[in-house]
Amino acid sequence: MIYNSYMNLISKKYTSVVVILFLMVLTRGSHLLTSVSLPDASFALFLIGGMLLKKPKWFISLFAFSVVIDLVTLSMNITYQIPINLGYLGLLVSYGIMWFFGSRIANTKSVLKFVAFSVLATLIAFLISTQTYNLLSGTFPEITIKQSIQTGWEYLPQSFIYTMSYIMAYWGIQSLFRRQFVSQKATAL
């Protein structure tokens, strides 16, 4: 009985990892698998990863995989402009914030708490990623902090809407699965 529960948990973890990795490849960079340009889901996937996987080893693995995707994309398409430099480290911090917030809301059943933490995490992660890119990447050598913030705000609505759309889709899907599982369990009793 305990062995079966343990194996079921392990199976769920690996299934979660495979799905997250697939979605990251599907939505990141120049979209290596499709010609359809899907919005980047990385922020949402790191929040979901924090909820489902929790352990730092999974965060490190997922971040390393995101770097590999970017490097492969750069090698296949030189017009794809993502600098792998000091500004790129902002993604490590941003993704870490999403992971941390995800781990904090992993067991919540409150949609209000889920949305509030997701919004807060997304805003903080966006602010850090855009500011580190603008100020540290070398792409804008003369940019001031004020100009960097103004430039970042131009991209906030689009990034926020995409990230929250993915996160809310996850909430809806997992809620349906949870309800289905609970109703099957109740029927069996």
Positions of PLM-derived features:
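Alpha-helical membrane segments and adjacent membrane-interface helices in multi-pass membrane proteins
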Residues: 37-99
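Membrane-embedded alpha-helical hairpins and interfacial helices in multi-pass inner-membrane proteins
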Residues: 109-189
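Hydrophobic transmembrane alpha-helices
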Residues: 2, 7-52, 57-60, 95-106, ...
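Hydrophobic alpha-helical transmembrane segments
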Residues: 14-19, 59-60, 88-93, 115-119, ...
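Short helix-perturbing small/polar motifs within transmembrane alpha-helices
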Residues: 79-126
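Aromatic-anchored segments of alpha-helical transmembrane domains
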Residues: 21-30, 64-76, 122-131
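Membrane-interface helix-boundary motifs at transmembrane edges
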Residues: 6-11, 49-57, 79-81, 104-115, ...
